[in-house]
Amino acid sequence: FGRIFPAPAEGRDLNPMLQDVGLIFHPPLLYVGYVGFAVNFAMSLSALIYNQSARQIARSMRGWVLFSWLFLTIGIVLGAWWAYYELGWGGWWFWDPVENASLMPWLLGLALLHSLMATEKQGVFSYWTTLFSLLAFAFSVLGTFIVRSGALTSVHAFALDNTRGYVLLLIFFVLTVLAFGLFALRAGSSSESAVKFQFVSKSGGILLLNILLTIATVSTFLGTFYPMLFQAMNWGSISVGSPYF
């Protein structure tokens, strides 16, 4: 640290762009959504441990899924609204890594919300529901890593602490390995896997939506992390922007 002498009578304020009503609520609302997905993750993990189907806990999960997704939606909308009238932030959406970090859990949460309704009412998509529940929280932790570690170049980068990034990355990998390892062990043991449905139906539409949202999430993930992988392999430096997305 450098000593300032004489000490100023008043400290320097925040960057004027950050002194905004939208920024008071934008980050907390996002993290409330992330934390809400932790409850769904815990419920699904408990069901896997005790060999219960997703349908048995679907009613209990529904409120938490809706709660998490709504808070995440409001947080993203507030951030986009703020970026729109602040010069230099790329309009409503810039496809910045930090923006994508909140978009991926939002997409998975939307898929989980629809899949959960089908599981609760018709007993279908039990595996989809469990998988999306685990992925939504895993990507929430990954999103926190993107924001707080400074691993990816971003106009939203608020910290460059490698230690914090390593801890978050370790949490992400531990949760992912344990949860999805248990999911793989339980796969095929649930009777819901034998439930049939007409493809041209509401369930068929939900299945198509699940596939599209999964593709959107994977595409966003690749576009976000490919530059970091490219640089880590010493292949040079590239930038993936809005034309890709």
Task: Set out the residue ranges of the language-model regions.
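Polytopic transmembrane helical bundles with strong interfacial aromatic enrichment
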Residues: 1-245
